[in-house]
């Protein structure tokens, strides 16, 4: 299979590129710049290549799709996260919505029928329950979630009008080696391994579904590989939601002497924005339809992440 990965130098995109290349697929990575991991990948695998381009520039997107005519596109390119989207709302809409429109239009023009779009639990806004499935109402509040839900709806229009197959993986707080964003559990693991003190004033009661990168990649590729779908949206997550206080306790247990603490109350991002109510994502649909079976519950994922950080590869 020939797969074009937009935003393929990013955290999830690069992990997908490594996995697909290793199993023998032809992988084309499209991004602003080649990351060290993608440079190493293209040097190691003849079936992996890189093209520089801007997702918001129609000529760039059209050129790569027309040249390579992929069997499928995994659309990762985006401004990711609540904090980044609040820092640049218009850039977020331009990249996330405008970029996705460029991808969809190039698919229409050049005969590419299949796309897997990396979406997010932020499309839901505040959760109505501790565990939610894909039928939960979409009421996004921040530019990130708003833009990603807009992409899902835009894709539905292209599906109806042009017969494309557009599938959406709603991810949730993906973590593991390579995570670039200063967010838990990265900040906690980094501090623990470095022997630094990190006391958070609040957030101890906050629960969210943390998904280890290997499980995330497995779920996305299962969506990619399945020929016929009854649904266009899947949760790719762990299906559980430990509290931040519980995560702190696990890390302290795994790294003796770690000086970590999370006080009670809401979780705040690095810019001070309070996170809305979260919880776990019900992954029954992905289990049933895709055979998805995450291998990294939070304790195992944290242990793997700590080991990678100690080895200097995180």
Which residue ranges define each predicted feature?
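Active-site helix of classical SDR
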Residues: 147-150
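Conserved Rossmann-fold NAD(P)-dependent oxidoreductase catalytic core, especially the SDR/UDP-sugar
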Residues: 75, 101-143
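Conserved internal alpha-helix within the Rossmann fold of NAD(P)-dependent oxidoreductases
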Residues: 58, 99-100, 220
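N-terminal Rossmann/SDR dinucleotide-binding element
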Residues: 1-72
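Short alpha-helical oligomerization interface
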Residues: 82-99, 133-140
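C-terminal substrate-binding subdomain of Rossmann-fold SDR/epimerase-dehydratase oxidoreductases
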Residues: 192, 196, 200-314
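NAD(P)-dependent short-chain dehydrogenase/reductase
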Residues: 9, 129-130, 153-208, 213-222, ...
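SDR active-site strand-loop-helix element
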Residues: 6, 30, 73-77, 115-121, ...
